[in-house]
Swiss-Prot record:
Described purpose of this protein according to its UniProt entry: Involved in oxygen transport from the lung to the various peripheral tissues.
Stretches assigned to the Globin domain: 1-140
Keywords: Heme, Iron, Metal-binding, Oxygen transport, Transport
GO MF annotation terms: haptoglobin binding; heme binding; iron ion binding; organic acid binding; oxygen binding; oxygen carrier activity; peroxidase activity
GO biological process: hydrogen peroxide catabolic process
Binding-site list for O2: 57
The keyword Phosphoprotein appears for this protein: no
Organism expressing this protein natively: Hapalemur griseus (Gray gentle lemur)
Protein name: Hemoglobin subunit alpha-1
Amino acid sequence: VLSSADKTNIKTAWGAIGSHAADHGAEALERMFLSFPTTKTYFPHFDMSHGSGQIAHGKKVADALTNAVGHIDDMPGALSALSDLHAHKLRVDPVNFKLLSHCLLVTLASHHPAEFTPAVHASLDKFFAAVSTVLTSKYR
C-alpha cells in the first residue's frame, strides 16, 4: 500500500524525470534484455541493438508508468487494458515485471542520483511493485 508520503515521492520523482521518461524506459528495457536474456523471448521480432527503434518500445513502458502516476489512486482502472494485454495476448511471465522494475530503478538512480534518496528509492520500489501487481491481476 502506498502511503501519502510515497505518493508525494513518486509524483515528485516522476516530475523530475519528465521529458526523459521515454529515454529512461528504453534504457531500462535494454538493460533488462542484456542482463536477463530470457526476457528477449517475448520480443523475437525486435532488433535488440543499442538505439534501435524496437528498444524504443521503452517509450510505451514510460507512457504506461506516467499514466499510472497520474492515476495513482486508481491504477487498476488506469492499467486495466494493459493488464488484459499482458495476461491474455502477450502472456508475459510475471517475473519479468520484477526484472524490469529492477532495471528501471537502476536506470533512474544512475541518471538522477541527487533525487534518488533512500526514501524515493523505497517509494519507487513500492510503486513498481504495485504496478506489477495490477499488471498480473488478470492472470487468474
